[in-house]
Amino acid sequence: FAIQSLVEAVQDSAQSPHQYTRPAGHPNLVTQLARRYSAHLRKEIDPFNEVAVTVGASQALYLSLQTLIKPGDEVVLFEPFFDLYVNQVKLAGGTPVFVPLTFVPYDESDENVVTGGEWILERSSLMEAVTTKTKAIILNSPHNPTGKIFTRDEMEFVAESLELADPECVVLSDEVYKYIVHSPPKERAPEESLFCRGHVHFASLPGMWERTLTISSAGKTFSATGWQVGWIVGPSHLVTRIHQLLPYVQFCASTVIQEALARSLPRADEPYQGHDSYYDYLREEYTRKRDLLADALRQSGFAVPDYDRTPGGGFFIFARIGKDIAESLPASRQFAPNVAAPGGIARQDWAMCQWMAEEHGFLCIPSSPFFSLERAQEGASDEFVRIAFCKTDETIMAAADALQRIARQASSPLAEDAELVS
């Protein structure tokens, strides 16, 4: 239906969607977004003063930081983090301050067995990082790269920390994956809000509307990242500052894409392919694909979260490299010079990803770019790789075959010799 909406918008000469539209957002789209967020946040949203439309969520974050941050200001990032955040903070003149999430394995009773686990935010770590220099905190839930869903308690820690920050400190809540909270067990399912099952909007917490800019986009929700339409929702005193900056960055996001999205949003609420809504279909489809990839990873010696214990979201698995897989990595590849790797050295995660791509045709992302350089060089990222499952079933099954080849090589005592001969 999103493609059909685009076709209709392209052909609708009466709406004239092929010309410039309002720089702060096409009227039809901001009206639809305001309607939706009014229901999400249980408050009336003004479409023309509390919504801004941007060229993707990345630009939404960039413009938010540009209006909030000046040289010397600090911005708190939860580590690991989406790698784009750090340089956007620096481009605004700010200083990133990293708060490590703590990885807690499910079981460490056998030192020879690597298990999955969960990432948690410790209140003390956050409180130590926030000072009167803190002008923004970037919160991303569901989280890229780990798939973590921040709990309500953890979000309340963030809200509490604002008491220690600059009085004008703002939380930038990156919620691009909010409709992709995987189907949790019923007893673990959090509150629901207009098809956002399992998702808590940070701005809905008591007193947080005035301190929050909520960022999202069409790309992840409608599997249309090339559409490049994002948005910001927040109080007028913050959003109108972004309105003032928008005409100097681009005149407007694509009018015809905005019109297509405005038509798609109400259609997404309707029954879709046997589900109550498109959003329910999306959630179940990604949960199914996640499980396909997770099973293949487990069978190949990687450790992944137990999703009955640890609800997840987004479309990545942050897998832990098993001991057999790690030992199969040729020693010549580890700590080898690599200009692309953080610090110019390929630690285990980087070397593993390069080896799997070059030798086995299996492509995933090393975890070190999601960590500060200091922590990556200390080895915090060595054990993890990020794998996407926003793929066709055929691609996931081909990945499973590649993982089996990797596992067979890992179980062979001649693994390193085979690499050297090749």
At which residue positions do the language-model features occur?
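Conserved glycine-rich beta-strand-loop-beta hairpin in the small C-terminal domain of fold type I
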Residues: A262, Y278-A294, V304-V339, A380-S381
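Eukaryotic N-terminal low-complexity, Ser/Thr- and Lys/Arg-rich leader segments
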Residues: E111-V114, E118, E128, K186-L194, ...
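Conserved PLP-anchoring active-site segment centered on the Schiff-base-forming lysine
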Residues: T67-V89
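Conserved core segment of the aminotransferase class I/II
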Residues: L6, S204-T287, D291-F302, R405-A407
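N-terminal small-domain helix-loop-helix segment of the aminotransferase-like
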Residues: F1-G56, L63, S264, P271-G274, ...
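PLP-dependent enzyme catalytic core of the Aspartate aminotransferase-like
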Residues: M127, A346, Q354-C364, S368-S422
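A short helix->loop->beta-strand "cap" motif at the edges of active sites that frequently abuts
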Residues: D73, G94, L162-V170, W209-E210
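Active-site phosphate-binding strand-loop segment of PLP-dependent enzymes
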Residues: L101-C196
